[in-house]
Amino acid sequence: MSTLAQVTLYFACQAADLSTQMVRDSEGHFAEDLDNCFRRGVSVYEELEQKLPCLAMPSVPCKPMFFSRLQSMMGFTGVYFPFTGEANVNVDAPACLVPATIAHEMSHQRMVFSELEANFVGIAAAVSCGDPVFQYSGWLMGLIQLCNALYAVSPDLWYQIAAASFTPELSTDWEDNNAYWRALESPVEEAAAQTFDTFLKSNGQDLCIQSYGACVDLLVTWFGDEAGAF
């Protein structure tokens, strides 16, 4: 099994184990209190800062984003304003990924401006913190990144991993996320993506929006040993 597949399986198993611990509504959908997540988000980097001291900075709480639905229509889950240091998170997006998005946006507050690095750092912070809700959200966000990469090269292996590891709870969150974004696909989202792509290029991020996918290389490198010993 390739390292990519090993790390994907590792993330799937971690997410599956935590999926049954999350608060859910009567239909099984993720129902953790997001207000509490925003309050607890200020401590999410404490563990990762021990391994990466360069990230040790005072935390500023993220805020729920006004007009979140509009941001979803443009394909955005969060916005960081570098001039004020304020990070805003889309709360109309699937709730199961909001905690990991909080961690992602807080990485920008720590001078991680590249989207490639911010995606990785946010996931690493979330899964290493002591909060099960942030951990689950981080494993899930990383799993989505890894599965997209694995499916592109080996769909059969991806299906084998999903069949072997996904719990009903994890499957529900996975489908909720896919259905939400599928329903919002439109020319508006495509135009916004092109505009953001141009913005990233102008700020020296040569991989542009594709840099989100390049996060997989960092995940495989960082978690490869753990996955190999799993």
Predicted regions and their residues:
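Helix-rich C-terminal "cap"/substrate-channel and partner-interaction subdomain
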Residues: L143-I144, A152, W158-E175
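Auxiliary, metal-adjacent structural segments of Zn-dependent hydrolase domains
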Residues: L18-G85, V91, A95
